[in-house]
């Protein structure tokens, strides 16, 4: 072991001692072994092994050990200390040093001087750590001290033997030295807290030495032959050393006794020292003061100086510190302290080491005794100026003094610090100037009047040294005071004082000082400093001063390192450096002989830039500063100024340029501009004069390095650009970064230029050097792996040329370096990207119209942005998949085993239960290619193909993968019971199994509790715990298995999520395979839990909550929120999928149980019977999203029935299945929800399979007539449902459709086979089947049959609202051929239908009116609130007062409803806008309004008065503005602002158009007059506080429809928005109100089917005749305004605002445009919007198109001229945005969405018309009587089936496509009103 390095051996022992338990025991054994060796032979103490052991014990002691361990360490340290001091372990500790041979003396002291201090340090550490050992250790140390002093006090022997004399002298030197070490360690130990008894002991021993004359007795021992020059001697004599060390220990132990550590008294930053109120140690400190007075007396001073023969100034300074400490404790300071300080200050030239102590002394003196504050401040200031300096690089005395000075400023005003800064800065003037203060004689600046005459002699001051001191002082004061204003002042003054006349050392120090202060300064001062540096460096280019240039460079590097990346300061410095380099390069007019300074200055700026760009994130820098443009110009500057890659001068900076290149942005960006060539030509750098020789040289360099590049067609600017790209990217390639070159082609303007081929050539040139550099590396760095991942992502880029270049590069790399796919991250990236591309491609089938553009991998840091064009995605997938296969196959030939292992690892690392994706291309690719890798057994390949099968290695690959999987998930619970099976071994195994069983059971119980309590359970935890328990359960006997299995089955039901059920079903299947005998137990538990879930929890399909019609939900005036219905879909699907998975599990195992375990099979049969009865009794939620599950239940029931048909149970079970199938059709025919084509295809597939099975049953089995009729009807209904869904799946047959299902023939839409007998049996199953059958088929006889059933069975029909609809359709007068009493109990009609019941065509019928009132009252106010206009119009026909009663009652419950009613009534009082022609309804409205107002009282009345007063104040501004109509806009604006200031804002008031918010603020400067010839409309902005639901249950909202009923889980969050509103006077807004009301209804309808269209029904409220409030659409601009801004067209606007067509922003905006365009187009046709000029069409900041101003709808057009004959506006510019032609994918989306929107709203056509019908007599000009309703219904094409309706809508699109009449109207508007198009 002696051969082991001593440091390694010592560190090993130390680490062993720091280990617990066994490691500590080994350490103790080793220590004891060496101590025994030392006892046996004392000569061994010199061995290095013993020394290492002792030092390791000391180091272990410094760790905080347990008490028993500390005692062992103390014993060891005690033993070794006695041995190294050569003291006998007796009571007197006698020395045995004299017994040693004299020859060992020279080497003895160095050895002990190294070890003994370490032992003392360790012992004192034990005193600090273990108070229980403190007294014993202190007692031992005191004994050592007494022994040493006794030996040193022993007089010299009179023996004249020289050998004996020499030995005696050595002994005294030895022990005197160690006594000094003793005090040194005490002083160091007191820096940290020591116990009081230890401190008191230390003070006692120090006092003993200082009081005695022991040090003076050792004066004669100055024998250099014995003295070891240790750092402990510090260059002093042994006697003086003892004085100094004991005094230092005295000071520290006294400070520790007072403050618990020795430094606190002198650290005036932490606290201000002061005399304590309680003085428990007064005696001790009084004795200290007496001792110090003795030393400081004139007698004591002279005596000590005479004995030691030196001035002893350092000792007296320490005595003075001790005296100050004691007097501070006592609270009295003698005046002699200041005298002593002055005396000592006079000696600093002789003893400069006094200064640190004097500085510390004066600072504490000033703090403790304020009378000495100015005295200390003055002297500290002078020290800061005149203190000597040394070139050792340490902190200067001036810095120490100024630092303490600054700390004292904390105890005075900040003005003191400012004054001092000014005083110091004013001393900075060059020596040759008149105001050079520091060049004056020193007597002007004498430190004290008491200084000796020698110090006052005239002498020339070292001006440079003093300047440097002043600069240091300014820096220290600024940094220590830590005040923003002080920083700014220091920077400002130092910049002002900067002069080139200073010595270079002063200038450079000033520059560096500014850098130290800068990072703490505010941004403004920092910017000033940065500009100062830049200006100076630019000046130095011509007037070279290399030292100053280097200082500026170093300073800027320091600033860059001291600021955070992307902070303002770093960014400011970065900008300054870039601008400086560019400026130097552009304005250079330096003569050739002076080029050296120019290049030197630029190179130093480049070096500073290196530090500045490190870690910079360009995306977060402020875009307005144009950092990429500055970098681009900087590289251009370097290129044209010979800093090129091939020039020697550039190579001198190659490392710096490489670091800049590594973090430099590309020279082009996507927002670079529309024309690349023109941008280059206009570039600031490139348009300067460039010498022809430079251009020629650049060309030749490019051609030499990139031979394939063609420079002939390129301009000078383009050539310089390519040279800059070559320089930048060649340097970047040295850092293994290649992808940047490919990214250049992402810039659209560059792609349109002549440069792409040149960029490609440069990329291929750099590719070879990149590969060569990479091949030389032994290990691929993580940054290089990141680069490969980036390059792989570019191989999937949406831009073709980018993708092709990236693939070309990757192909070359993979061919040259195939081993790269042996790196896990790279191979996994290839596979992950394949999966991402596949997922992106399949999105056409899952979320077609709003495709996800950004795809990220959860496993790796990968992301790709793809086009929204699916054909492009398909091309990307095809190319990448083809190349990926090639890369992996090529690598598998070079490194087959690595690739195979990695492929297996990829498959093994798959997180299988977090994602329900069933197809992952990456995994499939791994399996496919892994099975093709050459086998290790090559003999297999010589076998012929037997049985038409060629041998391959797939079995080997899968075997290896299986083994890997088996052993990678081995659970610790699987115990090895093989081998020794003795009794003890068996007992051990059983005991361990029992413990594991309890552990897993407890873990499962904890999971259960957490789920039941609603605590968050991570999927990882659930997966791990359940897996481990399942692995253990299959090894247990039946009892333990059953206990664990119950938990394993129950937990997924408690969690009830798709991922938990996928996990559970996988484990249940595995457990049944592992232990087949327990299968029935598991299935029975699954069924029991499932049945309990259905009965108690009722989630998903078995929920009792029924989704409401969109007409029964609140209508909102807000934009479409796609997130809300996506959230609803996800919630429903998450609760439906578990049932689907469970059904698949049960159905998949049924056949096996039927033939193997009939009892379990019967259990399944009984469960299915239970489920089917639930369905037939309508105890399920027939949501459109549950269609697949519903018919899968029925299909599985038929499978069971087929096995039971031969039994009595079979016929009944089969009949139950058919009834369950029919029950799906007991509701309104519904489309699907969302754009998931896969889901629709799955539904069609399930229904087709069910239909085929029913057809088979008809042919194979004789059934009852009733069953056969029901079965035939079910087949007809299934055909119709499939036809309807197929139409939805393929709305545009001629377009791009993914073939997912077989086409459904048109014949399936017919209803001719339905007979009365079928309807009769169906009625017995559920009347709704019959009642909703006419809704599915365009068949009048079928509707008549349904009506007959209603008339014949009114009692049964009252539960179904649709039955009343048929009655009204055939008997519109309301005279039904049934008993009127049934009407009272009928299911409530929709609120939109209520007001229609009061119209004259419905004859007076009290029962019908009572039913109407009950229906209206059954809905919450939030629903009826929407129909205020219709409710008010119903008063026109309310002869019995029912409508009036409803208004009054509802107004009493909702003040907001009452206010809206009042405003609407006021708006309907007159027929004209001027309020001159009363409406016939006016008396009724007046009466009702009076009743409503008179009924108000209390808070309701106050609220009414506040609201209407406030609103009247706002609207009155229009009246006051009328005299200003013909005046200028500024005058109008001033008047509005004047009136706005007068408005009083009361609590709770709101805008009529925003009743769901409260006004909390008014922008009183926001008033804006609007254009009008004779009216005075204006716009104003208000701050509105609203509430929104947070974490609301989306399913509950869809069911209940109101926020009030959204459940307890919903939380309301308050938020504020600024809303602008237009206040109109003289314009009838009622028609806009109606139109936007209808648009809101359409929005609800579209949302009900999850249709990806967009509408924004903004709010308009009519408040008086010709008056109203209109909400302003936020963030919108009219197409008219775009035209006035000289925008060529919408497409150009989209490109300008959102970027190139390939950009993500453009594609998102285009998608938004398509969605909104489709919705508004359909509504425009249905409601006949006219006057659609560009002033009435808006574009918002997200690309949506919006319509406003609905003055011409239904049957009227502007001026009666029918210019706009097209169904809707679809101009060429709109088509251009949507792809440019009717063949493009976005336009096909538009077509499909139009068709789907049309299909979705057709079932609600009558209700939409009812909302209009009740308004016919309102006097609105858009109506032509009942003809309006007739025409409106005709536009819905209700006589057509679904496919015919889709064709009809496509024909309308074709008619509108670039219609000439639309263009003519736009031209007409431009000619007449100046509206551009």
From Swiss-Prot:
It is found in: Cytoplasm. It is an enzyme of class 2 (transferase). The keyword Hydrolase does not apply. Residues 1593-1861 form the PI3K/PI4K catalytic domain. Residues 1747-1771 are annotated as: Activation loop. Keywords: ATP-binding, Cytoplasm, Kinase, Nucleotide-binding, Transferase. Residues 1728-1736 are annotated as: Catalytic loop. Residues 1599-1605 are annotated as: G-loop. SMART domains: PI3Ka (SM00145), PI3Kc (SM00146). One of its GO terms (biological process) is phosphatidylinositol 4-phosphate biosynthetic process. It catalyses: a 1,2-diacyl-sn-glycero-3-phospho-(1D-myo-inositol) + ATP = a 1,2-diacyl-sn-glycero-3-phospho-(1D-myo-inositol 4-phosphate) + ADP + H(+). Its main location: cytoplasm. Signal peptide: none annotated. Its EC number is 2.7.1.67. Residues 1305-1491 form the PIK helical domain. One of its GO terms (cellular component) is plasma membrane. Residues 1492-1625 are annotated as: Pleckstrin homology (PH) domain conferring phosphoinositide binding specificity. PROSITE patterns: PI3_4_KINASE_1, PI3_4_KINASE_2, PI3_4_KINASE_3, PIK_HELICAL. One of its GO terms (molecular function) is 1-phosphatidylinositol 4-kinase activity. The keyword Acetylation does not apply. Gene3D superfamilies: Phosphatidylinositol 3-/4-kinase, catalytic domain (1.10.1070.11), Phosphatidylinositol 3-kinase Catalytic Subunit, Chain A, domain 4 (3.30.1010.10), Phosphatidylinositol 3-kinase, accessory domain (PIK) (1.25.40.70). Acts on phosphatidylinositol (PI) in the first committed step in the production of the second messenger inositol 1,4,5,-trisphosphate. Belongs to the PI3/PI4-kinase family. Type III PI4K subfamily. This is Phosphatidylinositol 4-kinase stt4. It comes from Schizosaccharomyces pombe (strain 972 / ATCC 24843).
